[in-house]
């Protein structure tokens, strides 16, 4: 069974955007309401025009409540991005757990499909996800690509060059995400041509570099 904890862990060294962490259920609900409001607004008007006052009004909260959790609009956007990233990783992990992958491609498809799903049903995801990508703890590839590489290695064994795997996986996921983003920029439900091409591009790019990962390694 794949070790999905490799996908779900917190980013090392990632600073939280939230000024005050909620400690009670009511506080958590209040914070979620603020982020929900921000997500709706960025879908409607884009992140450049978002203000703290808009978020307060949409959430039915006072401006003081907003500032309790976020010092400014940029922090709100970072908070929304953090939530999108957490939900994306949770969706990827759930898909992987459900399908029980037999090849490296099954893992990649799980990530691509999770991204498509969230573009469709997670407000704010298309605007925030993919901006300001975080690097992994070693300063190398984007954090999610590094996590996926570690999962592939855990499931299918160490390749001849793990560093190159992480590098190429980062490029592949970036290419796939760009095409998925373009698909939803053209059509709210996702342009099927771009979604199909995302799979083709990613698979063809990675195929020659993941020949070792055809079958899960022996326990």
Residue ranges of predicted features:
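Amphipathic alpha-helical interface segments
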Residues: 37, 41, 58, 114, ...
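Helix-turn-helix
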Residues: 33, 41-75
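Short linear capping/connector segments at secondary-structure termini
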Residues: 94-98, 128-135
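N-terminal intrinsically disordered/low-complexity leader segments
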Residues: 1-29, 210-219
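Short, hydrophobic secondary-structure boundary micro-motifs
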Residues: 126-130, 161, 214-215
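Amphipathic alpha-helical linker/stalk segments
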Residues: 83-107
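Generic hydrophobic, amphipathic alpha-helix propensity
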Residues: 27-38, 55, 80-92
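Amphipathic alpha-helical packing segments from all-alpha helical-bundle domains
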Residues: 89-90, 106-121, 133-158, 166-174, ...
